Amino acid sequence: MAPSDLSSDLLARNRVILMHFDTYSASLSFVCWDDSTVLWPDALPDWSDIPAPADAASAAYDGEAVRQALIARYSFNPGELVRISNFDHWAQTESGPVRIHLLRFNTFQAPKALLEACDGSFQNLPELRRADKQELTLLRQVFNLFIGGSSKG
C-alpha cells in the first residue's frame, strides 16, 4: 500500500484511525478500509493495549510523519486532515509496539467520494458493529473523546 519512498518501518510501527466529525449534527463516522478494518494501512494481528513505551518520542512513532504518509499515499489535501494529539493509544504485537493515531477530516462534509476511490468508506458505529472487537474498543474511545464530553480534539 505504501509508496516506495515511505519507510516500511514507519508503517509497521503505526496505524491510523481516519474519521470525520460533523459538529452541526454531532455525526461521527470512521473510514473502513476494504470493508474489513478501520486501521490504516492494515489491521493489526493479535494485540493488547500497553502504555507508551520508553522510545515513544522516537521518529519511528511520529504522528506528523504518519499523517504525511497517508496524505502522500492518497493525495489528500493536507489542510483538511488534522492529527488529534490527545488520542494516544498503543498496542503490543508480536513484532513490537505499535502506535495508533487518530486523524480527522475537518471538512464540512465527510469526503465520501474521495475515500471510495481509495477503497475506503465512511461508516458510523452501528454500521461497524461486526468489526474487530479491539478496533471497536478504540472507536468507542474516539466516540467518548468527541461526543462523551471529553475534549473535542
Which residues fall in each region the model found?
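Nudix hydrolase/Nudix homology domain
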Residues: 38-52, 110-153
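Active-site-adjacent beta-strand/loop module that shapes the phosphate/pyrophosphate-binding cleft
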Residues: 79-81, 85-121
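Short secondary-structure junctions
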Residues: 71-81
